[in-house]
């Protein structure tokens, strides 16, 4: 089990890289994360939803994702509360305090999923959550040491040298851990080294000396990993998602507080001809060729935030200039005339006026639609594929002008009368090269990007090569025996 000294130290990519490396060696590997907190979710092949990081790790193992790989998924809806997804299905909502009381009841479910995966595999690579040293949350823990001890899984602690203070982070983790928890730790990894690794040889020795843990690798920064999807919205602001480009075509994206499934944007960010601008709160949307309003976990609250930051004014000005606007899932709902949440599924019950750019209205309902879809651009021979993941029924006269056709008598999405404003529930739309080329052609630019899925595969193989070179994988296998 790879735990971390903190959030965003690279646990997800370490697991993905080692998973691909072991899979290439001929082992049957399964990824597992007992508890994840993310609004970036994926549809599991056996139903329900899991964190997209675990879906990527499953891909690294060359298998379809299962809801057992992430049995507890927390999808933040406010500063103090989240939607709780258990084994792929929505379990309810809870404040952070209420969830702390609920965790011991979920341990059995977590162990059940882990047991199912363990029976399928030669090795299960487990990823912890956040920091292993948050001892204030240790009681009832199911994400880190609580799980490790319950499942009797050896632990490796990962630290991030790029952010500084990695010696203190690792030694400090050993210091604050309960002795029985510390006894589960077999070694450590130092991740994201930049420059000459030999300059930190003494640091590795000091960590070994101070902790008694075995050094299992000093892992340099891996540039190839930038082609892989970011897990956390904060990574977007830190520039850790898709490669930065400086193309002439500017696409602006407002960073909604509860932005969801933002890996929709990765293929556009990888285009040489495109500059994808993620606009943080407090900054105006720049003059752009297109604006994409992304998915959202709390649509009414994020629509209010969009107005608070003045982005609605920027979007309406962009519309008057006759430039393209695309809404994805929650962003699609925001483009309509109104959004209604009569039962308070995403927050306080009520309604909100939309941006009024599409002739639709949406009512949020308890049933969550989770399905993979494929078809083509309406009235065009342009194939599309992706998935839907939303709560809400959309109606209105605008639906007479659908964006997509997803089967016989299955129109989907909406387009304004002049074709400038578009909305859809289909995530993953830009991953298809044909639709991406079509979209960029409407912006008078050619697509120079290759197949995005091929790029992800190449990045996973490059990451596996990186792990083979810098991680003591044979020692990891010995620890798991």
Curated annotation (Swiss-Prot):
Pathway per the UniProt entry: Cofactor biosynthesis; adenosylcobalamin biosynthesis
Active-site residues from the entry: 329 (nucleophile), 427
Gene Ontology MF terms: ABC-type vitamin B12 transporter activity; catalytic activity
Q: What does the entry give for GO biological process? A: cobalamin biosynthetic process
Name the UniProt key words of this record, in alphabetical order: Cobalamin biosynthesis, Glutamine amidotransferase
Task: Enumerate the spans annotated as GATase cobBQ-type domain.
Answer: 248-435
The task this protein performs is described as: Catalyzes amidations at positions B, D, E, and G on adenosylcobyrinic A,C-diamide. NH(2) groups are provided by glutamine, and one molecule of ATP is hydrogenolyzed for each amidation.
> Hey, which family's this protein in?
Belongs to the CobB/CobQ family. CobQ subfamily.
Q: What is this protein called?
A: Cobyric acid synthase
Annotated organism of origin: Granulibacter bethesdensis (strain ATCC BAA-1260 / CGDNIH1)
Gene that this sequence comes from: cobQ
